[in-house]
A protein has these predicted regions:
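Conserved SAM/SAH cofactor-binding pocket of Class I
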Residues: 31-117
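A short glycine-rich, Lys/Arg-flanked "PGG" loop and its adjoining helix->strand segment in the class I
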Residues: 129-141
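Conserved beta-strand signature within the Rossmann-like core of class I S-adenosyl-L-methionine
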Residues: 142-149
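Glycine-rich phosphate-binding "P-loop"
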Residues: 114-126
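SAM-dependent Rossmann-like transferase core, predominantly class I methyltransferases
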Residues: 1-47
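Short "lid" loop at the C-terminus of a central beta-strand within the Rossmann-like core
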Residues: 121-123, 150-155
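Conserved beta-strand termini and adjacent loop/short-helix elements that scaffold enzyme active sites
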Residues: 20, 101-103, 172-174
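Class I S-adenosyl-L-methionine
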Residues: 1-2, 154-194
Length: 194
């Protein structure tokens, strides 16, 4: 274990986050995550349930919590160390609306107004598709997901797969090898767990 602090500077926020070995991007704010936070869509007006899927040490969850104080932000990760760091970073930043959880701790009937993720592409295509199916099907009617994916790691093929499986997907922006994908809830399927 080697805890260390890193700074996240955004136009509207200046945060210091604690990170450690054994979590994604332990030595820096990942450039894809930074891009998503700078260019990604804002939460819908009146949103009450937001999701950071694969929260890591909490960069996205903490920013969402501070930008959307009336919403509850679910920060979900399979890594216990990441969850501990996310929880501590949310408390330190004053984002008391961030709820850190294991995937199976999220109430089954809960639906999300919006989801943000820098998804774990390197887990493999089948595992990634299963992960996205599980959580995209929990978008509320009209809900949207905002994903950042490196183009060389399959952003375009992922967008095609999402479209093919009924989630309307648009490439909202592209820069420095990253794509920002906006994904809409499947029509007639919103909020139906699989």
């Amino acid at each position: 274990s080697r805890p260390r602090d890193i700074d996240l500077l955004l136009p509207d926020l200046d945060l210091r986050l604690t990170t450690d070995n054994g979590v994604f991007a332990a030595d820096r704010i990942d450039s894809g995550t930074r891009y998503l936070l700078m260019e990604g869509s804002a939460a819908p007006e009146g949103a009450s349930e937001l999701l950071d899927l694969g929260c890591g040490y909490g960069a996205i969850a903490v920013v969402l919590g501070l930008r959307n104080p009336a919403a509850r932000v679910w920060a979900v990760d399979v890594n216990p160390r990441a969850r501990d760091l996310c929880r501590a970073n949310a408390v330190a930043a004053g984002a008391g609306n961030v709820v850190v959880a294991e995937p199976d701790e999220v109430p089954e009937g809960l639906r999300f107004d919006a989801l943000w993720s820098n998804p774990p592409i390197r887990i493999g295509k089948d595992a990634l598709h299963a992960l996205l199916e599980r959580w995209l099907d929990r978008l509320a009617p009209g809900g949207r997901a905002h994903l950042v994916v490196q183009r060389p790691l399959g952003a375009d093929s992922l967008a095609s797969w999402l479209d093919h499986h009924g989630w309307a997907t648009t490439r909202r922006a592209s820069r420095k090898g990253y794509r920002l994908l906006d994904v809409s809830a499947r029509p007639g399927d919103e909020g139906t767990p699989r």
